[in-house]
Amino acid sequence: MWKWAGVVVMVWSSYGTAICPAWSHAKAEQEIAGLNAQISRWNDAYWQEGKSDVSDEIYDQLNTRLKQWQQCFNHEPATEDIPPANGTLRHPFAHTGVHKVSGKEELRQWMHSRRDLWVQPKVDGVAVTLVYRKGKLVQAISRGDGVKGEDWTARVQAIPSVPLNVKGVLSESVLQGEIFLRCERHIQQQMGGMNARAKVAGMMMRQNNKTVLENLGVFIWAWPDGPQSMPQRLSELTKAGFTLTAQYTRAVSTADEVEKNRKEWLTSSLPFVTDGIVVRSSIEPVGEQWLPGEGDWVVAWKYSPVSQVAEVNAIQFAIGRTGKISVVAVLESIQLDDKRVKRVNLGSVSRWQALDIAPGDQILVSLAGQGIPRVDKVVWRGNDRKKPAPPASQYHSLTCFYASPECLEQFFARLVWLSSKQILNMEGLGDSSWRLLHQTYHFEHIFSWLAVTQEQIEKTSGLNPARRLQLWHRFELARHHPFKKWIKALGIPLPQAAADALSVHSWRQLQDKDAVSWNQLPGIGTEKARKLVEFVHDSQITRLATWLGEQGIDGF
């Protein structure tokens, strides 16, 4: 593991609160150069060949990570994510871009000093300028760097939904909008981004392939020096054939109204992919004053990503109740939906080894069912990769019923299991509580807590009086659970269906059962029957059963 693994400092940058690794100068140069080279390769494929080797979401997040590292180490940026090397056409009016607010409160502050506000979906595609002269579409220019772009005229003219001829005030106009992938009933929350931006870019890069352009549409979101009234703009655009703008532009006056529309467009079917919403004021400066990065009359509020790139700070190993070793990645903290995620389970040692994850790697994390974090893939591996060795595989279902230094992890896992709702239902007793109690009373085995007196509990440091009373109450209630609950607390390897069918009511009856009688229970085969016989006759288990009998537990 790196000398500085897990050590971070915080700096404020234009990218927000950046997490800065405590790297040496040499290591920082190595890591920045490696990620920069990868992003450059993706850029070349995207802009020169019209293909994407990585999803939009991963690209955006790793590009942001690179900029954070460059900011942390005062490293001159060498990669631009929009290389307009061959873009020579100047936009009549610059593309300003949009500031992205962090949430509802920042949006509320921005809206406070502005009026005549309108909300639109943030359509996910590629930006374009359309130039109409004497009623004809004479030029289409890719966004490029916001000042100059490529000549896309012939390709845009081949998009069926783009009007080639317009009338009235649009006859001499410049429009800015988004070329998007046309969709049928796209529900953003369910279907995600579909890598739409990269797909559109790929289609626009291809030469002499007009067929694919039929799958594209355009959403107009700006009309520099157009009518001052938004309703008039929308009316004129609709009459010209740009119907989507009026359909998806709504007047708003509060952040609550914006939030309502944001939720609606996230969960309802739309004809395009989106990645958030845009709020704009119809009160704009004259077009000649538009500059890249200075569009303060418009902001975006993006959707929370369904997955996030996170840096692995450390790899830890956990020994479970049955002795199985699981691997956990400790992460740089990320936000997924309403959850703050700092750890993710990688599964068994063999799965971790197959995933090949080490501290310093960047992994894509999402939420599975019931909001449980999961690893989707490794998106970037660091240069200096050192993986810790897993603990020796010496634990199994019959180890660590008794406390010892080498057994503590499995020992505490057994305590957490027996106090869980489905076993003895000792609410509020988790890993940290059991560790505190063991530190105080030096438990010999997993049932030693039964010998702790009320007087001792009332003097336990680290617990307030109400918590002490609750703890004693839970201990007392546990004593009255039926025999079957207690054998589950012991850890007997008995499936639920077999436990339900089990007709014995004492430990003696359990020990009298042979493999043949065990095999008659549902879900019990030859191997499980053998393990059950082994379990109930194990010397440690026998001693624990005897001890439970001495404590007056039913059936023992």
From Swiss-Prot:
Signal peptide: none
UniProt GO BP: DNA repair; DNA replication
SUPFAM superfamilies, per the entry: DNA ligase/mRNA capping enzyme, catalytic domain (SSF56091), Nucleic acid-binding proteins (SSF50249), RuvA domain 2-like (SSF47781)
Gene3D superfamilies: DNA ligase/mRNA capping enzyme, Helix hairpin bin, Nucleic acid-binding proteins
A Pfam entry, by short name: DNA_ligase_aden
E.C. code: 6.5.1.2
Keyword terms: DNA damage, DNA repair, DNA replication, Ligase, NAD
Record GO terms (molecular function): DNA ligase (NAD+) activity
Active-site residues per Swiss-Prot or TrEMBL entry: K122
Catalytic activity: NAD(+) + (deoxyribonucleotide)n-3'-hydroxyl + 5'-phospho-(deoxyribonucleotide)m = (deoxyribonucleotide)n+m + AMP + beta-nicotinamide D-nucleotide
PANTHER family reported for this sequence: DNA LIGASE, DNA LIGASE B
Function noted in UniProt: Catalyzes the formation of phosphodiester linkages between 5'-phosphoryl and 3'-hydroxyl groups in double-stranded DNA using NAD as a coenzyme and as the energy source for the reaction.
NCBIfam families linked: PRK08097.1 (NF005987)
Protein name: DNA ligase B
Organism from which the protein derives: Enterobacter sp. (strain 638)
